Amino acid sequence: MKAEATVIPSRCARGQTTAAPGVQPWQTSVPQNTTQPKLLAPRQHEKSQKRSSLLKELGAFHITIALLHLVFGGYLASTVKSLHLVVLKSWYPFWGAASFLISGILAITMKTFSKTYLKMLCLMTNLVSLFCVLSGLFVISKDLFLESPFESPIWRMYPNSTVHIQRLELALLCFTVLELFLPVPTAVTAWRDRPSAKNDDACLLPNTPSHLKGLPVEPPPSYQSVIQGDAQHKQHQRLREVKQVTPDTWIVTDGAGIWTQTAN
């Protein structure tokens, strides 16, 4: 007895169907009620990073000016003995430097940790720093222009110790003017910055599909389980179905095609 087999290719043998992205290989369409992921725009994320970097730089400027106030104020306090300087009587170089130093540290800390209470503290300290700057401008201007205790002009050929003190106070005035332009930009940048790093990370995560909400979160399948599932699926496709049409003819159907087998 000889057997002749004729292969009739089916649709599965002629070509493979391409599944839609996000579905299983045996699915032909995307499940209903599936929400497409919404990611944060790259430009918006870059703006957030630039804003955080700017906040760190502003904090560094605060700290630098605070240290300069301490250096010049300490030198003036140690050298001036006979002159009556309002800037020293009010102790402006020290409480002004403390205000600027706290503002800078909070700005850098907020950029590092990004908490809501740090944001509020940063806004409050910058507001206090602004009042300290205005007060410092008033007391220094009173020493240099309104009630000047200096007899000789500030620019002379052979300066004495009094002229050096006058120049130091003028330098302190310049640093105070620079500090005047820092509290407002720092406060605005801190206000626009995100209150928490968790919110920034949450914007980068896709939305959960509505039909998956409430289900327990499970880890993704391993590589071996995926390979085993694919092999089982292929084995399931290759299961043959034998159907006898006539006493000498059988039709065999499997995943590769339809076989017609006859016996002579």
Curated annotation (Swiss-Prot):
Membrane-topology descriptor: Multi-pass membrane protein
Cellular localisation: Membrane
InterPro entries (alphabetical): CD20-like, MS4A
Pfam families recorded: CD20
Cell inner membrane in keyword set: no
Residue spans crossing the bilayer: 58-78, 90-110, 120-140, 170-190
GO biological process: cell surface receptor signaling pathway
Cytoplasmic side: 1-57, 111-119, 191-264
Region (Disordered): 17-48
Extracellular topology ranges: 79-89, 141-169
Keyword terms: Membrane, Receptor, Transmembrane, Transmembrane helix
Broad class of where this protein is predominantly found: membrane
UniProt GO cellular component terms: plasma membrane
Family statement drawn from the similarity comment of this UniProt entry: Belongs to the MS4A family.
Function in brief: May be involved in signal transduction as a component of a multimeric receptor complex.
The protein, known as: Membrane-spanning 4-domains subfamily A member 10
Native source organism of the sequence: Pongo abelii (Sumatran orangutan)
